[in-house]
Amino acid sequence: MNKVNFRILGLQKYQDIYYIMQKFITCLKKNNINEIWLLEHYPVFTQGNSDNFNKKYIFNIPVVKTDRGGHMTFHGPGQKIIYFLLNIKNLNIKISKLIFYLENIIISTLSYFKINSYSIKNSPGVYVDKKKICSIGLRIKDGYSLHGLALNVDMDLYPFSHIHPCGDKNIKMTQIRDLISNINLEKLNTQIINNCKKFLMMNNFEINFLNSIKIF
């Protein structure tokens, strides 16, 4: 039976999670497990493999080079990060279809909160009223997906003004807090998890919920 671990990890340093993610693939291959991590990051700018930015800091916020696709973005407290470490070969999911599923996980989640959102062809992510509310960046390694998506919930959007988010100088960012008056974070997590199971067809998987992580 296919297995998936949902890990609710709270606020984490990006560099630590990035390191664990790289090492985790070997563990997953040995145990035939899929992982979905829900967390937040301390303030950090991350570069995709399409960027050539050479500074180590922007206004005292660290800049970290990564191996994911896409351009520079910002992560900080109040932004829901969801990492997908999935055996896409076993699941028979192509990268284009995975992006489609991730977009629809967020679109469906936002719909629960009466927020109308949509995707744009050739511009991965989710948008509300021509502003971006969710960014997506992935990498495929040894048949597994790495990285995932970032959903702006209730955060400081100002650092985005120092960069061209996702490589587009015309993109404006938005967040759930600016669209509805009350955000129930427990319901948000529940909707995200339920939609992950739905769109990634995991309802018949063996599912575990964990709140810690280690390399085994």
UniProtKB/Swiss-Prot annotation:
Site (Lowers pKa of active site Cys): 132
Calcium recorded as keyword: no
GO biological process: protein modification process
Intracellular or extracellular location(s): Cytoplasm
Keyword annotations from UniProtKB, A to Z: Acyltransferase, Cytoplasm, Transferase
GO MF terms held by the record: lipoyl(octanoyl) transferase activity
BPL/LPL catalytic domain boundaries: 30-204
Catalytic activity: octanoyl-[ACP] + L-lysyl-[protein] = N(6)-octanoyl-L-lysyl-[protein] + holo-[ACP] + H(+)
Catalytic residues of the enzyme: 166 (acyl-thioester intermediate)
Main localization of the protein described in the UniProt heading: cytoplasm
Function: Catalyzes the transfer of endogenously produced octanoic acid from octanoyl-acyl-carrier-protein onto the lipoyl domains of lipoate-dependent enzymes. Lipoyl-ACP can also act as a substrate although octanoyl-ACP is likely to be the physiological substrate.
Family to which this protein belongs: Belongs to the LipB family.
Name of the protein this chain belongs to: Octanoyltransferase
Species: Wigglesworthia glossinidia brevipalpis
